[in-house]
């Protein structure tokens, strides 16, 4: 196991929860038969201690210990405001 902490960058899609945000991580995958690159989205729940994020913000999140059943990521910084 590596010592490097895993970080991802994505767009905030929901901030309706208290101290939590939903971040959409977009990646491109090559289609196995046709070879065209397709956009795939993964939604991740992250911890936002100060409730500073709004919908549309681009944020950096990092992996942490499990904080709830679905939350094991924490907000590192807001890259750009919406």
Curated annotation (Swiss-Prot):
Organism superkingdom? Bacteria
Gene3D superfamilies according to UniProt: Nucleic acid-binding proteins
Query: What PROSITE patterns does the annotation carry?
Result: RIBOSOMAL_S17 (PS00056)
Q: Which Pfam families match?
A: Ribosomal_S17
Q: Which InterPro entries match?
A: NA-bd_OB-fold, Ribosomal_uS17, Ribosomal_uS17_bact/chlr, Ribosomal_uS17_CS
Gene Ontology CC, one term:
cytosolic small ribosomal subunit
One GO BP annotation is:
translation
Record keywords: Ribonucleoprotein, Ribosomal protein, RNA-binding, rRNA-binding
Any one Gene Ontology MF annotation carried by this entry is: structural constituent of ribosome
Function summary: One of the primary rRNA binding proteins, it binds specifically to the 5'-end of 16S ribosomal RNA.
The family this protein is said to belong to = Belongs to the universal ribosomal protein uS17 family.
Q: How does it assemble?
A: Part of the 30S ribosomal subunit.
Any idea what this protein is called? Small ribosomal subunit protein uS17
């Amino acid at each position: 196991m590596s010592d490097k902490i895993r970080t991802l960058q994505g767009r905030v899609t929901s901030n309706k929860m208290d101290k939590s945000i939903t971040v959409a991580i977009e990646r491109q995958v090559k289609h196995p038969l046709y070879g065209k690159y397709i956009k795939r989205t993964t939604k991740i729940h992250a911890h936002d201690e100060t409730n500073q994020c709004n919908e549309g913000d681009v944020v950096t999140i990092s992996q942490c210990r499990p904080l709830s059943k679905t939350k094991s990521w924490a907000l590192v910084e807001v890259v750009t405001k919406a």
